[in-house]
Amino acid sequence: MDPLFEIDLGPVAKGSRDSLQSLYRQLKAAIQDGRLAAGTRLPPTRKSAAFFGTSRNTAVEVYEKLLNEGYVVSRHGSGTYVADKLPEGASRTSFAVQRPAGKGATSRLNGPRSAAQPASVPEPRLNSFWLCPEVTSAMGFWREERVQPVSRAHSATVDFRPALIDSRLFPFDIFRRVSAQQLRGLEKRPATFKSAQGNQGNYRLREAITQHIALTRAVVCLPEDILVTSGAQQAFDILARALVIPGQTVVAVEDPGYPPMRVAFAAAGAKIVPVGVDAEGLIVERLPADVNVICVCPSHQFPCGATLSASRRKALVELARSRSAVIVEDDYDGEFRYDGASLQALRSADAADVVFYVGTFSKCMLPALRLGFLVAPEWAMRTLVAVKNCSDWHCSTPVQLGVAGFIAQGHLARHVRKMRHVYRQRREALLMALTGELGEWLEPVPSFYGMHVAATVRDSARLDLELVAEILQSHNVKIHTVTRYYVNQQGQPGLIFGYGVVGLPEIAQGIDTLRKVLTRTGS
């Protein structure tokens, strides 16, 4: 159908002169507010006349009026199109859903605000928590720069941002084949479709997850201990809503740490207490006496990269047990270990049944799958499932079946082995550059896991890393500073070098650019 016929223009007035003005005004408004986008082809006048119930002469006059004013252009032999550039004095505005004015009503939900409602006035019907700049910045930068399209002219040549993966190396052909096999099996047994969904997650997938985490993370559990989620973020949200009593529950978070996890618990009404980290991970002795929930990345602290030492692991679990607190373990990239003695997940030694283990397939497979999981104590599972059901009944069944087959047939293990080799090479190249070319300014933080390396500023170097990051951006190199991950965005200065999407040539190029910038700006 023609785009013009798909938008809601409202009824066209009757009578030749009235219908002309009515149709003209509505088409002009649709062009100005973007419902008819630049370059949209308008249908022939005969079709428009028939659709809107006017004479063809009326439709012709409307088109000619818009053409004369510069709202549309005519291309010989092709038709009439919405102009790319509107006439002088006219401007396109974002289409906004209007709401009736009145006490407590918002004037518009999106698009530019009216003069009567300045940006400084909060929307009356929105939760004020989500209007806080700290919250919008914590969630905004994290998602926007990963999913918002950017023009080719502004795309980064070298992307050192953390938490990105090299999807170019994912075996899409194998995953498609496995997914098709699983769906064909479901098609042959339609009676099993309902049971294949399951509020707690597809049972075959939960079985496969138990095998996967037992082999890679020494976490031994039953399928009944697993809740399948739409990624790790939904797991954090579920835990926050299940564990937090608004205004009372004290949640300790690593500082610096992962902002979206912090926001999930804050949104549920928790009292957030930032706790520092060092070379051994979370500083356990700094945990508040009244702590109820402790959020930690013990294997590969985000973003600094430290591994929680064995002594601190023992102390952390004992502290949680003695204070009737619980631990949320974020094991976001634990499959990728390169050197050093292996330290198992906290959950693997959880005799006290106080650890909630959060895993994801975003790093070892694809973020687009939106699939994660939560290993929880038996006493909490019923509540967690009920909380999840408030937002969705279950994750995508085809995706769950595809991932289950991918794991069960050994493809995930093979893919992880391949990517571990790829990431190891990139990591070694980065570490060599950090200790060599950049050693005058930066010192890498010892780390054995993951897809990024953090480097702190040496005491002898005086650097404005925020300025350095801005200059690098102008040279098509994207990088994050450590300070942006602190609760108050103040702390030990450093840079984070993600190697998920950069090959060896890009690493060399990015390091060379950074060296030149540091030479000019550092002392």
Give, region by region, the residue ranges found by the protein language model.
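Short glycine-rich anion-binding loops that position phosphate/pyrophosphate groups of nucleotides
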Residues: 165, 298-302, 363
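Conserved core segment of the aminotransferase class I/II
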Residues: 175, 351-353, 359-421
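Conserved core of the PLP fold type I
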Residues: 179-323, 334-336, 341-349, 423, ...
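Short, solvent-exposed loop/turn elements at beta->coil junctions and helix N-caps
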Residues: 361, 441, 482-487
